Amino acid sequence: MIKTNDFTDYYTKRHANMIKQFEQWFRCVRKSATPHITSEQSERVHEIALKEYETLIPEIPYIGGKKVAGTRNLVGSVILLAYIRAFEKEGLSERVIGEIVYKSFDAFFARIPAVFGTLAGKLMFVPWYVKKRKKTMERVAALPYTEGFVSSFVPCVDGSFVFGQDVSECAIHKFYVKHDARKYVPYLCLGDYPMFRRLNIGFFRTKTIGHGDAVCDFRFKKGKTESGWPPENLAEWQGSREN
């Protein structure tokens, strides 16, 4: 397999764009953190997080670049890790930080135009698009990057969903474990709920790698996706936690 450190300059070469993404996230993070910190703390969080992010950029593994949608997800999670570290230094609890992370996702995906969400919801279950997603999963799973995502297509047999996706390896989980931040992974997983809600795609999940399960069992159906907060209402959050 190809070692991911063969591409250590991939993100550093795109430094300007990486910082642009960081600032885009800050607008969402600042809004979500307002009930918990002062404006002075907010500016300090930004400063601390930016320095943290600068140190993390060279450590982000190459998992396929622009040809893999998971790359953007991974970068977003690294940005959030930088903010998480800053919030920790401000003395915020895990639960409060987790709530800020979730609401930051909510604010981030709220920027998606409603018309795009309507189109995405209709496209998701068109047969040719389902086949395309299956092929994409197979292509990404075959990539030789050890720190990336691996998932497989799951056909429906009982009518409870249209199709599924079992993620057996998660780049975000690997990165967070490596940086002693595993306990926050379940909160990162919650970001899927506001995303699919905004895209008008029905989605549910009962297991996640972040909670110690072998796979994240994404299941897609027609209809609405429930809110991801508070997480105790979700099947994936129930039972013992192993983070």
Predicted regions and their residues:
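Conserved aromatic-histidine-acidic binding/catalytic patches
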Residues: 67-75, 176, 180, 184, ...
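Short, cationic low-complexity segments
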Residues: 194, 233-243
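Conserved short secondary-structure elements within globular domains
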Residues: 185-208
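Short, charged/polar, Gly/Pro-enriched secondary-structure boundary elements
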Residues: 172-174, 223-229
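Short beta-strand
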Residues: 154-155, 206-210
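N-terminal, charged low-complexity regulatory/assembly segments
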Residues: 1-90
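Amphipathic interaction/junction segments at domain boundaries or subunit interfaces
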Residues: 75-179
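C-terminal edge-of-domain segments
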Residues: 209-223
